[in-house]
Amino acid sequence: MPKAKGKTRRQKFGYNVNRKRLNRNARRKAAPRIECSHIRHAWDQTKSVRQNLAEMGLAMDPNRAVPLLKRKVKAMEVDVEERPKELVRKPYVLNDLEAEASLPEKKGNTLSRDLIDYVRYMVENHGENYKAMARDEKNYYQDTPKQIRNKINVYKRFYPAEWQAFTDSLQKNKMEVE
């Protein structure tokens, strides 16, 4: 099929455009991703940040949410008017956030699988003899007896239930062998 007739010009680079400013403005205008899923799902793009947060029962400015009382004006206390409470249209967001905050935090610190296997191997083969563990061929990092003892203590502290089950199984195996 023949090509359509007409002028085909190559695109020229726009030297007069400030690319740095263009990218900066594009980044500013792009709305950031809201990490909290509860807030993200309740967010209304047509409203401002202050309006969205007020609908959810959240405060934009913590200083305005809980104002400090001035101590000088004690005689005028009778005339003080309280600000009307803002209407919370989306209370489920606040309830979800409170429920999530009340959950216990998960422990993020764990030991590597290699270290767990190393400790189990050493205790299985040598029991409490740390000098023999230091001379073992599986002691790749040439740990001293004290370093090995510390690694075993760390394992005991991180996984007390697993350690108890492991030592019980070792005792049971020892009884069966004898």
UniProtKB/Swiss-Prot annotation:
Annotated Pfam families: Nop16
Residue numbers bearing the N6-acetyllysine modification: K90
Gene Ontology cellular-component terms listed: nucleolus
Covalent crosslink: Glycyl lysine isopeptide (Lys-Gly) (interchain with G-Cter in SUMO2): K74
InterPro entries the record matches: Ribosome_biogenesis_Nop16
Annotated keywords: Acetylation, Isopeptide bond, Nucleus, Phosphoprotein, Ubl conjugation
Primary localisation category: nucleus
Entry similarity comment: Belongs to the NOP16 family.
Protein name in the entry: Nucleolar protein 16
Organism annotation: Bos taurus (Bovine)
Gene behind this protein: NOP16
